[in-house]
Amino acid sequence: MYYKVLGQQNADAETVVLSSGLGGSGGFWQPQLAMLSAHFRVVVYDQYGTGASQGSVPAGYRMEDMADELAGLLNALNISRCHLVGHALGGIMGLHLALRYPALLQSLVVINGWTVLNSQTRRCFDVRRNLLLNSGVDAYVQAQPLFLYPGDWLSEHEAFLQEERQHQVANFQGMENLLHRLQALMDSDLTTSLKGVIAPTLALSAKDDLLVPWSCSADLASRLPHGEHLQMGYGGHAMSVTDPDTFNPILLDWLQRQASHPSGTPSDFIPVEMP
């Protein structure tokens, strides 16, 4: 998989891994890179089958497969302990990673995530999937900002949105890849397994998120042994993009609080074959 390692390179630097949502591209985290790189070693990557991580995502693909792919990448980089920050799909993948490799995660941040798919999120995914299947890639990409950003922010960033639309159409992950990744996300159900997540976990929500109601994050945190819920009042589903001035200090404070409080007992790290 395509990745970049940024920031601190000293031997005792702690590592923060950034995992994006359904789009999969590490470029999503641009507003956080400078801030995080000043304090941590930062790993940012394109998920398998997206961006520069070329490949065909098979039918029957699961969130567990995504977790194993990231574990394999980190093993190849000799990273046996890290903080993981995941947005939506990336955060839910992080929960699966925490269950499969408990010694790997020092802490976890799940941004606008959930325990099991909410009816509102399912409704939005069904609309987006129907757009893709019935109207094509450009229509899917054109509609995507409606689910990600607040209305006033959309009105004020027309040039950005046009540039983003062109870029996303040109670099689209492919219909089958997206549909298989989306199905894996929709099928994930952590209702009975969250008690096994030993890593301290921040469930961070946005009150005005159209795609994932903030109550999903509150529910998620309440089910975790070491869960905490924080809420931003503004920013939509992609509040790390729309309001980094609020988001970044929240994220940095959490990571710095967890840096000196490792969770669990390190055990042998299991190598995973890369796809």
Curated annotation (Swiss-Prot):
For this UniProt entry, which segments traverse the membrane?
none
GO molecular function (one): hydrolase activity, acting on carbon-nitrogen (but not peptide) bonds, in linear amides
Question: Per its UniProt record, what Gene3D superfamilies does this chain match?
Answer: alpha/beta hydrolase (3.40.50.1820)
What sort of enzyme, by top EC class, is this? hydrolase
Question: What does the record give as EC number?
Answer: 3.5.1.-
Swiss-Prot/TrEMBL GO biological process terms: nitrogen utilization; uracil catabolic process
The protein's annotated catalytic reaction(s) are:
carbamate + 2 H(+) = NH4(+) + CO2
Please list the residue ranges annotated as the AB hydrolase-1 domain.
15-116
Which keywords does the record carry?
Answer: Hydrolase
What does the protein in this record do? Involved in pyrimidine catabolism. May facilitate the hydrolysis of carbamate, a reaction that can also occur spontaneously.
Record's HAMAP family?
RutD (MF_00832)
The entry assigns this protein to a family as follows: Belongs to the AB hydrolase superfamily. Hydrolase RutD family.
Name of the protein this chain belongs to: Putative carbamate hydrolase RutD
State the species of origin.
Answer: Pantoea ananatis (strain LMG 20103)
**Gene symbol?**
rutD
